[in-house]
Amino acid sequence: MGCCGCGGCGGGCGGCSGGCGGGCGGGCGGGGCGGGCGSCTTCRCYRVGCCSSCCPCCRGCCGGCCSTPVICCCRRTCSSCGCGYGKGCCQQKGCCQQKCCCQKQCCC
């Protein structure tokens, strides 16, 4: 039994059997994380721990859901995000529901 579409990962993403089972538990069951992981180029982050174990490109979302594939994502909100420190900066705009951009990068 895989959660968040871990069963659809196959060998492409890896780490589905061990990582996703403990990371998701019952919280991500049902339609909460519909769509699964897919490949790491089309992977979507939903909630923290949902698809991060299957797709390395998704490392936990901050403050809700990420609707677009991102390279990195942290749990900090925009009010506490500092781009100068190099943390929480995504290479794509609109990575989070709450966002603040500086130097053409999205801090989430």
Curated annotation (Swiss-Prot):
Keyword Iron attributed: no
Region (12 X 2 AA repeats of CG): 4-84
Keyword vocabulary terms for this entry: Keratin, Repeat
GO CC aspect terms: intermediate filament
Top-level division of the source organism's lineage: Eukaryota
Coiled-coil parts of chain: none
Record family assignment: Belongs to the KRTAP type 28 family.
Biological role stated in the UniProt entry: In the hair cortex, hair keratin intermediate filaments are embedded in an interfilamentous matrix, consisting of hair keratin-associated proteins (KRTAP), which are essential for the formation of a rigid and resistant hair shaft through their extensive disulfide bond cross-linking with abundant cysteine residues of hair keratins. The matrix proteins include the high-sulfur and high-glycine-tyrosine keratins.
Additional information: Human have a similar number of genes as other primates despite the relative hairlessness of humans.
Stated name of the protein: Small cysteine and glycine repeat-containing protein 8
Gene: SCYGR8
